[in-house]
Design a protein with these regions (language model features):
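N-terminal nicking endonuclease/strand-transfer module with a His-rich metal-binding environment
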Residues: 1-168
Length: 168
């Protein structure tokens, strides 16, 4: 499993990227954690509004949006929606984002299974979650723990491959 963390200035851009993929039929939303309603009962506006409310708690933070992709080896195709959601939730908890509102999208637009997670780094009390060295200090141990628990191909054992987008 390979985890990629990108931070940004615009939750709208990250959110719209994923929702546009859903509209194109190459992704689906499989989870909305720490939201007041179940995923299927959330409108587009409701999904984005909770993220925006968090950001309003601390307007001094410029890099406040977090876009994470969890990428699995092609041989791990066929993971069920519930398993993928469980993996995303464990990963977020282990990197210190378990209490944050986050959206989980399953994408089908490449030659390997992968998830996208949309969240922010502003806590309910307005303090920010430090993103400095998040990859090394939190993401790497979380990734390795999940690889071991689910018996996934270790990122270190995978050869770098070019993934070719599949026609839809």
């Amino acid at each position: 499993m390979v985890a990629v963390i990108k931070t940004g200035h615009s939750i709208h851009r990250i959110f719209n990227y994923n929702e546009n993929k859903v509209a194109e039929g190459v992704a689906s939303i499989i989870g909305a954690e720490n939201y007041p309603l179940d995923t299927e009962n959330l409108s587009l506006k409701m999904k984005l509004c909770l993220q925006e409310r968090h950001l309003a708690l601390n307007t001094n933070v410029s890099r406040n949006s977090v876009h994470i992709s969890l990428n699995f080896a092609p041989s791990e195709e066929g993971l069920g929606k519930d398993t993928l959601k469980e993996i995303a939730t464990k990963y977020m908890r282990e990197i210190g984002f378990g209490e944050q509102p986050f959206l989980v999208y399953q994408h089908f637009d490449s030659g390997h299974p992968h998830l996208h997670i949309v969240t922010n780094n502003i806590r309910n009390d307005g303090s920010r979650i430090d993103l400095h060295h998040l990859g090394i200090r939190k993401s790497e141990p979380a990734r390795k723990s999940i690889e071991k628990e689910y018996n996934f191909v270790r990122a270190e054992d995978q050869k770098r491959q070019r993934y070719i987008a599949l026609p839809v």
